[in-house]
């Protein structure tokens, strides 16, 4: 076997090895990314034309009849801003029912401090993404003010609605979009 043949075989072997390594890394990355995204976002979301679903329990019941649907959970979602000691950050606020949300998302696995169980109706608790909490400089037990864009119309103009919430938990998914821009109430 000539020197050129040896170099050629070595080059082909090195190329195949590099291809195998790259494909393995990409497959692992794809699986990790899918796991993280589907841990906080469902495969399918059903929304109404105007964003509301008046009869969602009936719709959920119909969806559950499909053999490939494993679970469903209702939520409401809106944009808002949080204010703490002059620091203001915008985020997506998602209203959930923790017991039902457990069937479709893995938020409990991502909780760094606090608990989803403290999200109780009327308690005004909130769970923040880790980067959002860091940028607001808050920890579990601190208060944040939610500024909702839907306000009250007065003679002086539209006054936004303000409500104080207690941080009952902080989660970290590992994806900036969720960690810096999502809050659960």
Q: Language-model segments: which ranges?
A:
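Alpha-helical transmembrane segments of multi-pass inner-membrane proteins
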Residues: 6, 10-13
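A structural signal for hydrophobic secondary-structure junctions
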Residues: 57, 61-184
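Small/polar loops that bind or transfer phosphate-bearing groups
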Residues: 21, 25, 48, 182
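Membrane-interface junction motifs in transport/secretion proteins
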Residues: 30-60
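Short active-site-proximal "capping" loops at secondary-structure junctions
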Residues: 12, 50-53, 77-80
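Alpha-helical transmembrane segments
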Residues: 3-5, 17-41
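A common structural microfeature
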Residues: 11, 41-43, 69, 90
